[in-house]
């Protein structure tokens, strides 16, 4: 029997995803038409003999999360539960805190994955690789190749070229270590908890030496810095390298890139989710997802990489490209939306143009990843995709360029390179 654990974080995390995470927990943000974490759940449901999926995070249980889990459970026919941490315990602390729940039923192995990654999720090949490399006493990290300069932003893995054993692991090194990076998806045997327990006991001993220390801190354990670094070179940790698509979803801008990756996968996994040009319907270019309840005028042109949410209205002559339009939004006649996320129930007026700058990886470098740009550089706002928070109103005939508009704003003029509070 197998299980899967998805680490979904909490409201204090994912702040780079604001203003979109104000309205909905980040793991439930729709990417390519379905909540971000549903892609993980679907991949897990396809693994033979995987009986339970546990979501671990420190969001207060809320209606959106509960109804999503109920629907997912019915759709994918697998048990799904949410376990709430009492505070942020780190990637290792969360699974250690709930180790009894994870080990109940006696799974031979379990997957652990971060909710904010977009991937082809090669879980079955990882499982086969795990069986060939020590099974119950070994652990597998999913790795991919990055270019030299960007590898410094990730966990770097030095591996034996023949056996794929991890010899050395460094989280976000100061200088170049390796171009194989950690994808945030792991396969563990239950014996991993012995190694996490060693870290827990070490933390306890260190805190006993400190005055006025908090007992909570002993439970804060980071898999990457605390566990992998000590396991490397001991013949227990292996890396399974994937050539498939992979990206982090840290900033709101990376959601559009992740949407593109998932939409391109739909061609083989879910062709029914992709729209096509039909007589009497809008013109579709490339991969486009349109929710069945959306109302799109036949003269509109959509794509490539467009995702239209529930109940959206798209008027005559509208052009949308490289964008996500969330539920209830209205794009009035002849408006133009490029490289933008249009928030829930927002309105874009007639002949208005809303445009951002894509934050895509370098297309000429096959190993390039998306850069997590800082919001400001040299005192200026970094050009990025445009984001309209929920319930924003854009008047007719204005241009909004490279701007972030916080929720419930009614704009009256054009803006460029601004955060509108």
Swiss-Prot record:
Region annotated Hexapeptide repeat domain, chain positions: 274-421
Family of the protein in this entry: Belongs to the transferase hexapeptide repeat family.
Single GO biological process annotation from the record: biosynthetic process
Region (C-loop): 357-385
GO CC annotations, alphabetized: cytoplasm
CDD domains, alphabetized: M1P_guanylylT_A_like_N
Signal peptide, first to last residue: none
Coiled-coil ranges (or none): none
Region (Substrate-binding domain): 2-252
Known role: Regulatory subunit of the GMPPA-GMPPB mannose-1-phosphate guanylyltransferase complex; reduces the catalytic activity of GMPPB when part of the complex. Mediates allosteric feedback inhibition of GMPPB catalytic activity upon binding GDP-alpha-D-mannose. Together with GMPPB regulates GDP-alpha-D-mannose levels.
SUPFAM superfamilies named in the record: Nucleotide-diphospho-sugar transferases
Protein name stated in the entry: Mannose-1-phosphate guanylyltransferase regulatory subunit alpha
Alphabetically ordered keywords of this record: Cytoplasm
Subunit structure comment from the entry: Component of the GMPPA-GMPPB mannose-1-phosphate guanylyltransferase complex composed of 4 gmppa subunits and 8 gmppb subunits; the complex is organized into three layers, a central layer made up of 2 gmppa dimers sandwiched between two layers each made up of 2 gmppb dimers.
Binding site for GDP-alpha-D-mannose: 85, 248
Record remark: domains: The N-terminal substrate-binding domain adopts a Rossman-like fold and has a binding pocket for GTP or GDP-alpha-D-mannose. The C-terminal domain consists of a series of tandem hexapeptide repeats that adopt a beta-helix conformation. The beta-helix forms several protein interaction surfaces involved in assembly of the GMPPA-GMPPB mannose-1-phosphate guanylyltransferase complex. A loop extending from the C-terminal domain (C-loop) is involved in interaction with other subunits of the GMPPA-GMPPB complex and may be involved in allosteric inhibition of gmppb catalytic activity by gmppa.
GO molecular function: transferase activity
Primary residence: cytoplasm
Localization: Cytoplasm
């Amino acid at each position: 029997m197998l299980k899967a654990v998805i680490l979904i974080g909490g409201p204090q995390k994912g702040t780079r995803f604001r203003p979109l995470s104000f309205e909905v927990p980040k793991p439930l943000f729709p990417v390519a038409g379905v909540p971000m974490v549903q892609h993980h759940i679907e991949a897990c449901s396809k693994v033979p003999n995987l009986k339970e999926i546990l979501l671990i995070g420190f969001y207060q249980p809320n209606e959106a999360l509960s109804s999503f889990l109920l629907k997912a459970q019915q759709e994918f026919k697998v048990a799904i539960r949410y376990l709430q941490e009492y505070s942020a315990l780190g990637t290792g602390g969360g699974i250690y805190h709930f180790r009894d729940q994870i080990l109940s039923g006696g799974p031979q192995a379990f997957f652990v994955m971060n909710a904010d990654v977009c991937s082809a999720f090669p879980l079955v090949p990882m499982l086969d690789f795990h069986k060939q490399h020590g099974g119950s006493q070994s652990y597998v990290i999913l790795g991919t190749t990055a270019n030299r300069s960007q590898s410094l932003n990730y966990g770097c893995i030095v591996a034996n070229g023949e056996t794929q054993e991890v010899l050395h692991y460094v989280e976000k090194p100061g200088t170049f270590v390796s171009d194989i990076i950690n994808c945030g998806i792991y396969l563990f045997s239950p014996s991993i908890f012995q190694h996490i327990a060693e870290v827990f006991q070490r933390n306890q001993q260190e805190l006993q030496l400190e005055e006025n220390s908090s007992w909570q801190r002993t439970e804060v354990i980071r898999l990457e810095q605390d566990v992998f670094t000590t396991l490397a070179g001991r013949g227990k940790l292996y890396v399974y390298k994937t050539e498939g698509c992979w990206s982090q979803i840290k900033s709101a801008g990376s959601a559009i890139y992740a949407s593109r990756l998932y939409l391109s996968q739909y061609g083989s996994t879910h062709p029914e989710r992709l729209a096509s040009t039909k007589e009497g319907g809008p013109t579709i270019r490339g991969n486009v997802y349109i929710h069945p309840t959306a109302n799109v005028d036949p003269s509109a042109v959509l794509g490539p990489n467009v995702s239209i949410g529930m109940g959206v209205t798209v008027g005559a002559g509208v052009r949308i490209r490289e964008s996500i339009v969330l539920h209830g939004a209205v794009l009035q006649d002849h408006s133009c939306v490029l490289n933008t996320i249009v928030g829930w129930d927002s309105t874009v007026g007639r002949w208005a143009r809303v445009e951002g700058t894509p934050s895509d990886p370098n297309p000429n470098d096959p190993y390039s990843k998306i850069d997590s740009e800082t919001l400001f550089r040299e005192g200026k706002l970094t050009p990025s995709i445009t984001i309209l928070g929920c319930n924003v109103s854009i008047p007719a005939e204005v241009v909004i360029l490279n701007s972030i508009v916080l929720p419930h704003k009614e704009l009256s003029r054009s803006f460029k390179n601004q955060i509108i509070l």
